[in-house]
Amino acid sequence: RKSGGGCVYADMTNIMFSYITPDENVSLTFSKYINMVSEMLRKLGIPAETSGRNDIMIDGRKVSGNAFYHIPGRSIVHGTMLYDTNIENMVGAITPSCEKLVSKGIQSVRQHITLLKDHISLDIEEFTAFTRRNLCNGEIVLYDDAIAQIAHIEEEYLTPEFIYGNNP
């Protein structure tokens, strides 16, 4: 991903989101949007808290990782929320170094994460609808030129070089 940082695992039950804003102050912008996500989770009775610079935690376990980058005139905050991710598949795909886990006092990836489905009674469709109602403030219509630009970006992201090893 353009924002750098760790690896992002994606499957059909890992909810991803992005905010694109003209705000340029990195720490204020990042904090604003990550806190919006945490507050939304708290509305559901989930004891979500931001941790460090880029994680959202539930009872000390990570449920959301987030990143930030800036391009001229825009800042982008994006993240993931683990709803019902297959932990075994994720662990097989993402293998942080033992040194990183030990430095954080973590025995394994499994010990460090939690899934939203274990904290709420909403199914993924209901949770996604709740997320849209609480975090989206409107609809944007994309025109042909924007769609063409998106298709060009998508081509880059679908190359094996990007998927398996291109780092910003």
Describe each PLM feature range:
Residues 1-27:
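N-terminal lobe of the biotin/lipoate ligase/transferase fold
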Residues 1, 8-10, 49, 69-75:
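Solvent-exposed alpha-helices and their adjacent loops that cap or buttress functional pockets
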Residues 14-16, 53, 62, 76-80:
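Broad gene-expression machinery/nucleic-acid interaction feature
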